[in-house]
Amino acid sequence: EAEQQYKIFVLKYFDERKQETLIAGDMFEMEWKEQIDTSIPTLFIVSGVFQYFYEDKIIEFIKKLKKEFPYGELIFDTARKKSGLRFANWFIKRTGNPEALMHFYIEDSADFSKKTDTTLVEELTFFKDARELLRKKLNFITKLFMKIADYKRQALIIHLKW
């Protein structure tokens, strides 16, 4: 019942495209994999999720993905260094949402890929494209914070494969 309601909610905001599958469920439990052909190459995009869990849980999840999907790639966003996480949590507290604090960050992407037995394909700064696309729509302070975060590499997009 809850799974069906979630799927209806998701489909209200996201269109399911050809060769895309939107699945409701606990990502750590892996029952959702039954809805996907695990024998073909699969790209997982996990956006705005990992930060809310601890590193050991994320590493365990990636290892499960590797076991269930032999030809996989994973793209996700993360804070880099504890300072990036401190900044994000400071900002979250200011918005009045102290229950949504972030825990996961990566000090070194190459080291993290070794911990997960994956290959680091790419590491990108998080806001570069957004700053260019939205430059006329953002206020000065937002642009400044985004630029500082990119300059200090505090927020990243990581691409791993196995």
Q: What is the meaning of each model-derived region?
A:
Residues 1-162:
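Alpha-helical subdomain
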